[in-house]
Amino acid sequence: VERRIPEDLEILDVEPIVVTNPYTGAQATLEPDAVAVYDWIKGSEVIGHSKDMETGLEWFRKHEPAAYRLLLD
C-alpha cells in the first residue's frame, strides 16, 4: 500500500522519531511521513480543524494501526 500523505504536508524529518502519547506515556517510533501526519493531527486538534484532524486519523488507522492505538486512540 502506497503511503501518500495528505496534500500540502511537508516531511521535515529524515530519520524515524519516537513519539510519546502525552496522556498515557506510551511511545511509538514513527517514520518521517507519519511524523508529518501526526503533527498535522495534533495541530488541527489545537486549532479546531476537525475535518483535517479526521483525515489524518483515517491515514493513521490505515497506515500505522499499532501507532494509532498507542498514540491517538
Per-segment meaning from a language model:
Residues V1-K42:
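N-terminal acidic leader/helix
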Residues A28, G43-E45, P65, D73:
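Short linear sequence elements within intrinsically disordered, low-complexity coil regions
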Residues D33, D52-M53:
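Alpha-helical structural motif
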Residues V46-S50:
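Charged, low-complexity interaction regions
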Residues E54-D73:
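Short, compact, well-ordered microdomains
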